[in-house]
Amino acid sequence: MKRLISCLTIICALNASAAAETTSNPCSRWISFLKPVCQRIHQTWTEGHDDMYFSGYAWHNRYVYSNEKIKSYNETAWGGGLGKSLFDEKGNWHGLYAIAFLDSHRHLEPAVGYAYLKTASVNKDLKAGLGYSVLVTSRVDYDNVPIPGALPWAALFYKRITIAATYIPGSSREGHENGNVLYMLGKISL
């Protein structure tokens, strides 16, 4: 409950701060070399389409984990979230998201982040993209401390539906296995 209240307080503070900024120049207080980042995030937030995310699968690499470990892990990473996204003037995709899902140990794992995908059009309705996501998450097994990260991201876009995947690298030292998970999620643009 404390975590939920903390998250809501941070979101309200960020919204109040954003509302206080002048709408004509929302990134005026940013350091000059970071202004393009701020401007793209602001554009995504203000001009982007609303998205609904859903997740349901986390594949643990069979070359890293023993059969016993695989059986003990949750691979149905049910969850969902909301986001905003847009295709820019070059046709590349930008997204902001907040999701929560069940991790490998069936604990709730929240994540917020930004994703960028360089896309190629297969036809009018179908696009493929490769890129990255920068995010902040927290996990029970790390005492719920916010953990920043960057991950590769790939996606197929078909009209308003997207199927995406990321690979979470990890360690394969015996007795200290972690990560090495292919995480799949979907998105519907509303």
Swiss-Prot record:
EC number: 2.3.1.251
Signal sequence range: 1-18
Major location (coarse): membrane
Catalyzed reactions per annotation: a lipid A + a 1,2-diacyl-sn-glycero-3-phosphocholine = a hepta-acyl lipid A + a 2-acyl-sn-glycero-3-phosphocholine; a lipid IVA + a 1,2-diacyl-sn-glycero-3-phosphocholine = a lipid IVB + a 2-acyl-sn-glycero-3-phosphocholine; a lipid IIA + a 1,2-diacyl-sn-glycero-3-phosphocholine = a lipid IIB + a 2-acyl-sn-glycero-3-phosphocholine
InterPro entries, A to Z: LipidA_acyl_PagP, OMP/PagP_b-brl
Subcellular location: Cell outer membrane
Pfam families named among the record's database cross-references: PagP
Keywords: Acyltransferase, Cell outer membrane, Membrane, Signal, Transferase
Swiss-Prot/TrEMBL site (Role in lipopolysaccharide recognition) positions: K69
Family: Belongs to the lipid A palmitoyltransferase family.
Subunit structure: Homodimer.
Protein name, as recorded: Lipid A acyltransferase PagP
Upper lineage: Bacteria, Pseudomonadati, Pseudomonadota, Gammaproteobacteria, Legionellales
